[in-house]
UniProtKB/Swiss-Prot annotation:
This is Endophilin-B2. Residues 1-27 are annotated as: Membrane-binding amphipathic helix. The lineage of its organism: Eukaryota, Metazoa, Chordata, Craniata, Vertebrata. Belongs to the endophilin family. Its main location: cytoplasm. Pfam families: BAR (PF03114), SH3_9 (PF14604). The keyword Cytoplasm applies.
Amino acid sequence: MDFNVKKLASDAGVFFSRAMQFTEEKLGQAEKTELDAHFENLLARADSTKNWTEKILRQTEVLLQPNPSARVEEFLYEKLDRKVPSRVTNGELLAQYMTEAANDFGPGTPYGKTLIKVGETQRRLGAAERDFIHSASINFLTPLRNFLEGDWRTISKERRILQNRRLDLDACKARLKKAKAAEAKAAAVPDFQETRPRNYVLSASASALWSDEVEKAEHELRLTQTEFDRQAEVTRLLLEGISSTHVNHLRCLHEFVESQTNYYAQCYQYMLDLQKQLGRFSGTFVGNAESTSPPPAAASPPAVAATTLPAVPTIPVVPTIVGVPNTVAESVLNPNEVKPPASGTRKARVLYDYEAADSTELALLADEMITVYSLPGMDPDWLIGERGNQKGKVPVTYLELLS
């Protein structure tokens, strides 16, 4: 108990000394040990890194989860060390509503079929969004959060210790300065005509006491200077580690961009597929709508047949020879009559599975290699693909052209 009381009294004395030194520095009544310019630059760089990391972290969280209530809920789960429950994305919820609406309206109706197709695409978009959020949280948000909650807390702690060591050092310097001034005053030769012998003896005794005080202050200053230098070196090493933090965050940023690129590429591909599927449905829906109403009585048989026959897929053929008029003609593509152009062909790798819509198209399997080429006047979004004896149109977006 006696030891604890002494330690408490010592800590109180140190705290009071630091408070006095800090107050006098703020009032301009005490000298302050300045750090070197390189150290100050490291401190400013660390503070800037911390501030911008916090802003980037918060805004990325808003990007991934715009709902503030959901963010607060996830924050509480993390603080309680509990697993965050799986949350249905907006796309998946919309897909559920569309599917239920299609079942209510009738899945065989044009509107019901379209709702089912769009709902399925929305579900895939929602799943892609979920994967992107998960990937971004692990590869980008977690490293930023680890820096703020780990490395930065260590740096802040060591900086506070360095600040205390500096206050102790400046307080020792101030005490030494006062002791030397008092010693010099006590060591001054007294005027015997104005000083009585008794006061002269007291002055000599005080001079000896101040000499001891100066030696004690110098010893404390050396110890405090050593502790300050050691703590400054520790803090400097931590601050120089900010460069490694930047390298790590740069790598995480690349991973975040890659995840975001894959996410938007998936969404774009899903919407392209949906657009093509809806394009195939549109002719059927129009035909069904027209077939429900009888043709006019005055209509001729060929006209009636034209209104009921389904549309035949065609591709435009545009001549590319210089001097020939640029006229567009509609012709039906017959894969057996297609021949490679004289300019040659290219190899391509299939990126995704593709189901042929009709006999003019070629079904594809992911990662297989095919031969492709273009014909004059073809739609730039399509190529002619060959696999063995099979030929047909293939979409460019499903291919990776190889040199």
